[in-house]
């Protein structure tokens, strides 16, 4: 909690950009502080990814994964964007991390 506001970190495949944005808006209007992804690797931000060499791309993805775990640490709970029930390996690992750290886990579907 930050004051009277619950902090929620969004997790899920970045292919679901529209759902991330929609859920972020709704949770914010519901009175929560929402932490989301910084980049959409699977559904946007191509200008970032297209000019990276393989080594830089790998290091950047590792950094973003590590940063997302830090975002989970800051949150009271996570909200999983699992459109059609889809949960990929990265999201599965974030859910496991959140549970190991005593965070509540909620799901879109």
Residues covered by each model-derived region:
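Conserved catalytic or regulatory cores that recognize and/or transform ribose-phosphate-containing ligands
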Residues: 1-109
């Amino acid at each position: 909690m930050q004051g009277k506001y619950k902090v929620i970190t969004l997790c899920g495949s970045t292919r679901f950009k529209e759902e991330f944005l929609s859920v972020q808006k709704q949770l914010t209007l519901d009175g929560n502080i929402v932490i989301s992804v910084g980049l959409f690797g699977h559904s946007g931000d191509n200008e970032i990814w297209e000019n990276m060499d393989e080594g830089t791309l790998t290091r950047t993805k590792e950094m973003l994964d590590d940063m997302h775990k830090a975002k989970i640490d800051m949150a009271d709970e996570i909200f999983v964007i699992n459109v059609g029930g889809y949960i990929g390996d990265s999201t599965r690992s974030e859910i496991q991390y959140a549970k190991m750290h005593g965070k509540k886990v909620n799901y879109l579907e």
